[in-house]
Amino acid sequence: PLSSPTIVGKRQPFPFLKNGEIYAVVVLETRNKKERIGIIPCSNNMLTRMVELPGGKGRYMLIEDLILHYIGKVFKGYKVKGKSLLKVVRNADIDADAAYDEDLDYREFMEDLMKQRKKLSPVRIDLSREMDETVVDALCRYLDVTPDRVFRSEAPLDVSFVFQLQDLLRRNTELFYEKRVPQKSPEFKDGQSILQQITEEDKLLSYPYDSIRPFLKMLTEAAEDDSVISIKMTLYRLAKQSKVIEALCEAAENGKEVVVLVELRARFDEENNIRWSR
């Protein structure tokens, strides 16, 4: 019930394939010996990517491999002649300068561009298995991609599952590299105000090699210091959860003037930056 299988035909056009998501594609033979292409999306927020197998802990299978294995049960009444996992990589280049109209709000303009990016033309097709040339040609025709842009890989098409695997195996410390902790900068003295220290002389932090704590402490001190009336900063790339933003918001709530220049075009972090700029 959580999957939406599609059989491409006259009544059902080729579906839109989202950028970077995994699909199971299958070649189906009808009773009349005609071939059809069937597609099942493997990405679903309701399904976990890694499925633990019975018979003992530590054995897992990716949901897309499970779907591909049993795909014949989904398309009952058809003969499976070939199958593979498929991933489409779409163009991510957006020319903001060429399309921008000075009469538009730039933030709203960038939001529209982010929506357009999701629908840009495919530039690459990744397959997990070899497929008949006629099928590959059909996929290329549907997606408007040349055959030299089709690649086959025995490795998983999306390795982001490693982060989930990391959480599952957290107790097995022997499987992990020793954690690298940012070093405590020798530039700063303990027990003294960061603002006072940078007033006396310039300081340099190189993140992630140096700990960012002195910088965050400086912002917190500035937010709480009555002598600070204004904070001005330039931010290029912001995370979904940002302690820098938390400190700046605290400063604004304490009556400080907070002016931040945010780069809305930080590649692949545009959505975070747009959200925080509000």
Stretch-by-stretch model annotation:
Residues 1-278:
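N-terminal localization/anchoring segments of enzymes in phospholipid and broader phosphate metabolism
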